[in-house]
């Protein structure tokens, strides 16, 4: 199993607020994103990642997001196996983001 790093929602928010250039990859389904969008994120559903891998930059720092952090962890591990060296999973997903970093994001 490939080890991946994780980032807490509050740490990601601080980095984004500072203007750090972090690529946010949201792997949720379109219906989930419609309920609780992550501003500025690029959206590729988890099941489409292998066929759309060439759309992603393996050299860019990437934070992968889903609802609770499980799908995003799987995608982050896959990306790491594919040679992405700067990939992180958002701990707790958009749900934890809403709870701890941005309460204006709806919870579902």
Positions of PLM-derived features:
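Rhodanese-like catalytic fold shared by cysteine-dependent sulfurtransferases
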Residues: 1-23, 30-61, 70-108
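Short, surface-exposed ligand- or partner-binding patches at beta-edge/loop junctions that are enriched
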Residues: 65
């Amino acid at each position: 199993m490939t080890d991946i790093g994780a980032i807490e929602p509050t740490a990601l928010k601080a980095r984004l607020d500072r203007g750090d250039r972090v690529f946010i990859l949201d792997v949720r389904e379109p219906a989930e994103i419609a309920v609780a969008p992550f501003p500025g994120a690029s959206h590729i559903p988890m099941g489409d990642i292998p066929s759309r891998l060439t759309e992603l930059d393996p050299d860019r720092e990437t934070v992968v997001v889903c609802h609770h952090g499980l799908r995003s962890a799987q995608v982050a591990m896959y990306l790491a196996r594919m040679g992405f060296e700067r990939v992180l999973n958002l701990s707790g997903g958009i749900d934890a983001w809403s709870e701890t970093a941005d309460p204006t994001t709806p919870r579902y």
